[in-house]
Amino acid sequence: MSRIIMLIPTGTSVGLTSVSLGVIRAMERKGVRLSVFKPIAQPRTGGDAPDQTTTIVRANSSTTTAAEPLKMSYVEGLLSSNQKDVLMEEIVANYHANTKDAEVVLVEGLVPTRKHQFAQSLNYEIAKTLNAEIVFVMSQGTDTPEQLKERIELTRNSFGGAKNTNITGVIVNKLNAPVDEQGRTRPDLSEIFDDSSKAKVNNVDPAKLQESSPLPVLGAVPWSFDLIATRAIDMARHLNATIINEGDINTRRVKSVTFCARSIPHMLEHFRAGSLLVTSADRPDVLVAACLAAMNGVEIGALLLTGGYEMDARISKLCERAFATGLPVFMVNTNTWQTSLSLQSFNLEVPVDDHERIEKVQEYVANYINADWIESLTATSERSRRLSPPAFRYQLTELARKAGKRIVLPEGDEPRTVKAAAICAERGIATCVLLGNPAEINRVAASQGVELGAGIEIVDPEVVRESYVGRLVELRKNKGMTETVAREQLEDNVVLGTLMLEQDEVDGLVSGAVHTTANTIRPPLQLIKTAPGSSLVSSVFFMLLPEQVYVYGDCAINPDPTAEQLAEIAIQSADSAAAFGIEPRVAMLSYSTGTSGAGSDVEKVREATRLAQEKRPDLMIDGPLQYDAAVMADVAKSKAPNSPVAGRATVFIFPDLNTGNTTYKAVQRSADLISIGPMLQGMRKPVNDLSRGALVDDIVYTIALTAIQSAQQQ
């Protein structure tokens, strides 16, 4: 039977959607089979528009289901005709029709607004009807812990008081947020106007909040400035602006708003990464200054021109190179004052199509939800947990945090690498050592609005390179290495980073955002060598499918492994899967299953399976298996009924590189899924390669993988 948790907001602007998304992510991390149930749609725009939480869950989660809520107009019609009983019956019917397979059902209540003053009484009725456990969601505002205590008590009393044993706890959102004079945490751009620093902030210790609360505090979520950074395109849409230069309008984030009414020298401090610069279109000096900043690497959020003046063609020509850097420029017909008023009404709630921000909100809020409470929701369930993609990513970061490793990044001045290093430092994933010119690295960081603080080290190759010449000569003397050649090779930061790893100055190396796979792997193979007991280096990809994570090997290194090599690849891959929380059930893949086929290719897989089983009888390995027999239970029953792996494989070993690489790319592209890797196996020390098209998140997770590998090799 499902556990039913109902999140009930105590007022407006509590951030209900953000809290719901965070709780969903916290449950997904634990592999909970979850369903989201919004009984009644309550779109912010009013009317019968799609419900925000339901739409976001459907668009962004492959493991959580969300039922279609009843339309508000229909509900209001039932209530006005005194048919509440009919409404409750429909809610129950909708609930049962859409939540049958869920372990936990998360119900999102209605927000009490001026238009929906019946919200709380209806929330109470729904909670009683579904026999749901109630969790209140509130924001702090200007309240002290004592005032919050009183507010929690009053809210509990309106839902039956202490006698209502279904009241489980409270989640306090926007803790220590800046508020206005009326105590409101305003969901509009006033939070990021340049004068927002004047806002009042209450510094409440979450521990004291727990002590004073009459209900268990199941989450205390600090307000975060980063979560309200909106895209430039969202502002352009809100203003119905004409786009002059699209640039990176879909990805650039606005973190501050500046009205450029002063002379240039008095505004330069505001020409920074993430700034929305608002100026009259007849101020070419501001436009040119912004373009100069962009050409110097400053990622200004966007430039908004007011007044409706046509841009001078000569100025437009002058700014072409700046526009090519990705600077978004858009224009409105209203004057600056009218534009200011329009910006004030911009709502900072996360748009349903802003997947990057949704992911950030989910991860951030989930980190502040009580883990013991989440664990307790399925404590009595006997079903084995699947490792979903969110659970896998969370596990990666947690294991990396515990490892506490130093990872060298030879491409230290590459923009994506710098961003990834900052994220790793912020999350405590690893200490990142950036190789490169310190001034250039700091310039790249500043241009992207990235702070390089604790958890990041910068090593100047020009300063340290000479100290590694002797060691390189010693390691490669049998290959005729001389000091002159060693100095030439050490001009390559990958070689330098590899020597740092070889001498235990760092714990792992990640490269490839700029370098080829060969350039990344060759120096470690020459200088680090294979691990004891390993005769070869292989690789795996972690394939983040909608409901679970698969391991594919080897799709990147060995072109045509022998049966002995294939057996070792299988064992290495199984151990890698287990190390990252995936129960290894290894399928040795071929074009035929069992004894149905013959030929050298099938015999190689059959022999590799036998060798792997002999070497590691503790592992669940079977083959030859066709891919469909390995993953589909119904096919497995007919093709391999006695196989312990068929129908539920988690590790897939391909017979050669051609098959493996083709399959990995076909699955990744056709299913539009995330893959992490290749992760190298069999090295004496961890080294990992990146795709040259790697995103920042790809680099972050590869750094985490590398840190975990280092911890496991000790």
Curated annotation (Swiss-Prot):
Compartments in which it is found: Cytoplasm
Keywords noted in UniProt: Acyltransferase, Cytoplasm, Transferase
Recorded coiled-coil stretches: none
Induction remark: Expressed during exponential phase, decreases as cells enter stationary phase at pH 7.0. Expression is inhibited at pH 6.0. Part of the ackA-pta operon.
InterPro entries per the UniProt record, alphabetical: DRTGG, P-Actrans_bac, P-loop_NTPase, P_AcTrfase, P_AcTrfase_dom1, P_AcTrfase_dom2, Phos_Acetyltrans/Butyryltrans, PTA_PTB
Protein family: In the N-terminal section; belongs to the CobB/CobQ family. In the C-terminal section; belongs to the phosphate acetyltransferase and butyryltransferase family.
Protein name, per record: Phosphate acetyltransferase
Lineage of source species: Bacteria, Pseudomonadati, Pseudomonadota, Gammaproteobacteria, Enterobacterales
